């Protein structure tokens, strides 16, 4: 204030004194300061011209387009092919009798999503990070080339700025916070009309899912209450259940994955594909909806892919409906009830009987 006062020869009432003890006095003091500043503007046309010209110049200096910005008016999130279940290519799936974990099915579809987006729109659709589990949870698939061997590796702000895979550590809360923030950044010309930006995907052990809950719940509230359009989050609860394997003594959480259900109705979809071939159809169907959060529960070990046709089971693509028949009623027996099964080891055990 002193520099301003000396330069424009104006006094600030009670300048240098302690602030008033009551709110009314503080408001009065603030008003007097503003009056002093405005008095200079009223009596100094040169200052007004300078401020106006400077503001106009700054506004006109903002480019209408930034050449090196990867996000353009072409919007991959509106590309129905990426999430179209009937058109999913055969090489996303493995043949009956082969052994594969469902997390590998996730990796394949992740690479399919971003490869299609990069090839058609010049940028990935999904930015991913993991709690030091990028490869074991297979979220690293978002940085791999679909149908090829190219691996973009981990993002580096100097050496590798094009990779969609962030090098995060065991910082679950921070990871979900960063991606919740990222998925609210809308580059669309009218952010109230549609979302054009990046989706986020993050992973950790299912037993540590609760560490991600807070920021994701806040993201859910924005999606629910704000008129601004937001993106989507893929919340991977990896290595879930008794299949946690060698880490089971410290990393096996029975109840923790239940935190993925603590959202308002219609604001999260929980996916539990029990085998490799169900992942892509289930995730594609979920991403085709307007639901902003998808929790994908995956397991660690490989299991044998069933021969669905021989067993009379529905196609793996029926996983896109959320539930399907493994075995229908025996028409020669009375109807004795329904068995509902979910999860890798439980469903695998039932199918093998």
What does each model-identified segment do?
Residues 1-171, 181, 336-338, 343-345:
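Conserved acidic/glycine
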Residues 1-34, 38, 247-353:
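Glycine-rich ThDP/TPP pyrophosphate-binding loop and its adjacent helix/strand module
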Residues 134-262, 277-281, 318-327, 336-353:
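Thiamine diphosphate
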Residues 128-130, 202, 235-237, 270-274, ...:
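General beta-strand structural signal in soluble alpha/beta enzymes
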Residues 63, 76, 86-89, 101, ...:
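Proline-rich intrinsically disordered, low-complexity coils
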Residues 39, 43-46, 56, 60, ...:
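Generic secondary-structure signature for well-ordered alpha-helical cores
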């Amino acid at each position: 204030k002193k520099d301003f006062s000396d330069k424009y020869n104006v006094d600030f009432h009670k300048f240098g004194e302690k602030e008033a003890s009551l709110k009314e006095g503080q408001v009065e003091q603030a008003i007097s300061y503003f009056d002093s500043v405005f008095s200079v503007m009223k009596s100094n046309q040169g200052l007004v011209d300078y401020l106006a010209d400077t503001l106009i110049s700054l506004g006109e200096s903002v480019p209408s387009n930034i050449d090196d910005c990867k996000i353009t008016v072409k919007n991959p999130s509106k590309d129905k092919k990426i999430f179209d279940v009937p058109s999913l290519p055969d090489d996303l799936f493995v043949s009956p009798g082969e052994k594969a974990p469902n997390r590998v099915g996730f990796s394949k579809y992740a690479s399919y999503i971003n490869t299609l987006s990069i090839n058609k729109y010049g940028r990935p659709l999904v930015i991913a990070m993991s709690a030091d589990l990028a490869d074991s949870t297979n979220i690293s698939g978002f940085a791999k080339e679909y149908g090829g061997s190219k691996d973009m590796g981990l993002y580096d702000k100097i050496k590798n700025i094009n990779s969609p895979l962030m090098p995060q550590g065991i910082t679950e809360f921070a990871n979900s916070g960063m991606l919740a923030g990222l998925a609210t950044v809308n580059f669309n010309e009218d952010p109230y009309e549609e979302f054009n930006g990046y989706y986020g995907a993050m992973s950790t052990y299912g037993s540590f899912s609760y560490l991600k809950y807070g920021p994701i719940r806040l993201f859910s509230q924005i999606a629910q209450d704000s008129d601004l359009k937001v993106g989507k989050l893929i919340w991977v609860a990896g290595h879930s259940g008794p299949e946690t394997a060698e880490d089971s003594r410290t990393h096996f959480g029975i109840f923790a994955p239940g935190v993925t259900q603590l959202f308002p109705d219609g604001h999260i979809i929980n996916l539990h594909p029990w085998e490799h071939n169900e992942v892509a159809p289930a995730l594609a169907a979920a991403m085709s909806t307007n639901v902003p959060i998808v929790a994908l529960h995956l397991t660690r070990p490989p299991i044998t892919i069933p021969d669905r046709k021989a067993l009379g089971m529905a196609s793996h693509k029926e996983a896109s409906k959320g539930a399907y028949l493994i075995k229908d009623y025996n028409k020669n027996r009375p109807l004795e009830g329904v068995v509902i099964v979910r999860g890798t080891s439980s469903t695998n055990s039932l199918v093998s009987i």
